[in-house]
Amino acid sequence: MAQYDVLIVGAGHGGAQAAVALRQNKFEGTIAIVGDEPELPYERPPLSKEYFSGEKSFDRILIRPATFWAERNVDMLLGKRVASVDPAGHSVTLTDGSTIGYGKLVWATGGAPRKLACSGHHLSGVHGVRTREDADRMLGEMERTTSVVVIGGGYIGLEAAAVLSKAGKKVTVLEALDRVLARVAGEALSRFYEAEHRAHGVDVQLGAKVDCIVGDDQDRVTGVQMHDGSVIPADMVIVGIGIIPAVEPLIAAGAAGGNGVDVDEYCRTSLPDIYAIGDCAMHANAFAEGARIRLESVQNANDQATTAAKHILGGTDAYHAVPWFWSNQYDLRLQTMGLSIGYDETIVRGDPANRSFSVVYLKNGRVLALDCVNAVKDYVQGKALVTGGVSPDKASLANPEIPLKTLLPA
């Protein structure tokens, strides 16, 4: 049986950063990363943006080249999947039947694309957006595709819609709620992006009720049937309605959890010597007033990886990173700082018509978060307002001529 001092399951941002952080902090033990894809760790956000549009080749989205891992003695066990975990025996069993022992286990598996509760997912031309294989399959179909239906008006769906619209495709976005980005942003930002997509020719349908995905006798997708019986024609369907955390082996082994696996402030699960990080980790977040949440972001994956690595090495620094996120759509660069969970007021700073503005989220007058569209200065200067829990003058906050840094307490 192979044996590693630290075994990392998941070859995404979190898994890669865990290995990097261990070596950066002078860990000299053996490390291996198990990944279910054949590729080296790569950046996932570009799959619905720069890689999908052809702006970046795959080599340019690798987190590190092969030589980096070899030079740091990190073994890459790629194209392999963990089937079960034995906490008592400190080992995992792969789907091929082989067993690997560990001293510490870091679970960084992210999640699998959530599917609609309807038929048609098996049809050729229906895609999720999680892996390079997903993106390559879509790219391979682009030439013969004229019309696309995107199910889900979140960031992944809207980013894909922007790329497809720019490529000249007829795009329809179906969102079940009454606005796009409803789960992650306030109404001002939602309406702005809805208008932008409509201006680029995207048909945005809100309150949309999908009945099923339909296809021909060759099992090729032909459209999406709505609850009223109408069918929206499509050569391609992209489903972007969130993920299901990939934690089944840990839960089966006895780890506490449900919507992900529960971790403490050091990213430890309830099982001995097992950590969980990134999209699959349910944690108490100070920027959500201590609520237990999962964060699906590169920032969270990387920062939790560093927290876990340092704790493995005996550190006592708890996870307390300010959340941030970004999205590129058309020529719009959205940058978010903090979490808007529980906000009771928003202030729009600047004019959305100028395509450069910020939305500030407040609770009891205190700044929780900012969404900054083509407003880098607000994003950079707003971090201190979020981390400091500042309650600035609202008129000054709404005035884009007043730099945010001047609103900090003296």
Swiss-Prot record:
Catalytic activity: 2 reduced [2Fe-2S]-[ferredoxin] + NAD(+) + H(+) = 2 oxidized [2Fe-2S]-[ferredoxin] + NADH
Highest taxon of source: Bacteria
SUPFAM superfamilies: FAD/NAD(P)-binding domain, FAD/NAD-linked reductases, dimerisation (C-terminal) domain
InterPro entries associated with the record: FAD-oxidoreductase/Apoptosis, FAD/NAD-bd_sf, FAD/NAD-binding_dom, FAD/NAD-linked_Rdtase_dimer_sf, Reductase_C
Keywords: FAD, Flavoprotein, NAD, Oxidoreductase
GO molecular function list: ferredoxin-NAD+ reductase activity; flavin adenine dinucleotide binding; oxidoreductase activity, acting on NAD(P)H
EC number: 1.18.1.3
Cellular component GO terms held in the UniProt record: cytoplasm
Cofactor requirements of the protein: FAD
EC class (word): oxidoreductase
UniProt: FAD binding residues: G14, D36, K49, V82, R130, D279, V298
Family membership: Belongs to the FAD-dependent oxidoreductase family.
Subunit description: The chloroacetanilide N-alkylformylase multicomponent enzyme system is composed of an oxygenase component (CndA) and an electron transfer component formed by a ferredoxin reductase (CndC1) and a ferredoxin (CndB1). In vitro, chloroacetanilide N-alkylformylase assays in which CndB1 is substituted for CndB2 demonstrate that the two enzymes possess nearly identical activities.
Record function comment: Component of the chloroacetanilide N-alkylformylase multicomponent enzyme system involved in the degradation of chloroacetanilide herbicides (N-alkoxyalkyl-N-chloroacetyl-substituted aniline derivatives). In vitro, catalyzes the transfers of electrons from ferredoxin (CndB1) to NADH. N-dealkylase utilizes NADH, but not NADPH, as the electron donor.
The name this protein goes by in its record: Chloroacetanilide N-alkylformylase, ferredoxin reductase component
Highest classification ranks of the organism: Bacteria, Pseudomonadati, Pseudomonadota, Alphaproteobacteria, Sphingomonadales
